[in-house]
Design a protein with these regions (language model features):
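RNA substrate-binding interface of SAM-dependent RNA methyltransferases
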Residues: 1-87, 149-154, 158-179
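Active-site/ligand-binding-proximal alpha/beta "capping" segment
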Residues: 89-122, 126-127
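A short acidic, often aromatic-flanked loop/helix-cap motif at beta-alpha or helix-coil junctions
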Residues: 71-76, 91-92, 134-136
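Short glycine-/acidic-enriched loop or helix-start segments at secondary-structure transitions
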Residues: 25-26, 51-53, 94-96, 116-119, ...
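Short, acidic/turn-prone active-site loops that include or flank metal/cofactor-
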Residues: 45-47, 72, 110-113, 130-135
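Structured adenosyl-cofactor binding patch, chiefly the S-adenosyl-L-methionine
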Residues: 34, 119-160
């Protein structure tokens, strides 16, 4: 019997609570493209006002839906999707110890505030990234998505890793580690 989950069973979405900075949202969109997230939801009106200044240098926005919703905990996802809040919250699980569900909606508070207690209460899990001080929103999303990827991906062979590197790097990068 094969215990490896079918990649089709994986779903990953990001929920941003009233994001303020278009550059942060642009960085989140790029991270979602790099780490194969499926959807980005956001609440509030600040991003809509800032959207003309949006930065997405990798054009990931055409690949990943970015949808305004009224409430993060009521995002239109399947019932089996777990809601995971990522917040500096007492009694939260350190990300280093967390086992990600196959299907998850990860919620992040705004750059200048936190998720609400109501959102925390409605979450299936709450995790935090052990740091001294708080991280930037896009840095937090990047770390979370990287952690999810490394914990759910099989170890790549050397050949597979090189194929991934070739398909991911900038066209001017032809670097090789010499034996």
């Amino acid at each position: 019997m094969n215990d490896t989950p079918d990649m089709q069973s994986f779903y990953c979405a990001i929920g941003l609570g009233n994001p303020k900075s278009p550059s942060n949202v642009g960085s989140v969109v790029r991270a979602c493209g790099c780490f194969s997230a499926d959807h980005i939801f956001y609440t509030g009106s600040r991003y809509d006002r800032a959207e003309p200044f949006y930065t997405d240098t990798a054009n990931q926005r055409n690949e990943i839906p970015l949808t305004h919703i009224d409430s993060l905990t009521e995002a239109p996802v399947k019932p089996e999707v777990k809601i995971i809040s990522v917040e500096l919250c007492e009694n939260a699980v350190p990300l280093t110890d967390y086992r990600h569900p196959e299907q998850a909606l990860y919620l992040f508070g705004p750059e200048d505030y936190s998720l609400s207690q109501e959102t925390i209460n409605k979450s299936d899990d709450v995790v935090f990234i052990p740091t001294t001080g708080c991280l930037n929103l896009s840095a937090t999303v990047n770390l979370l998505l990287y952690d999810r990827m490394i914990k759910q991906t099989k170890v790549l062979s050397h050949i597979e890793a090189n194929d991934l590197i070739r398909s991911s790097r900038d066209c001017r990068n032809n670097l090789i580690v010499k034996d």
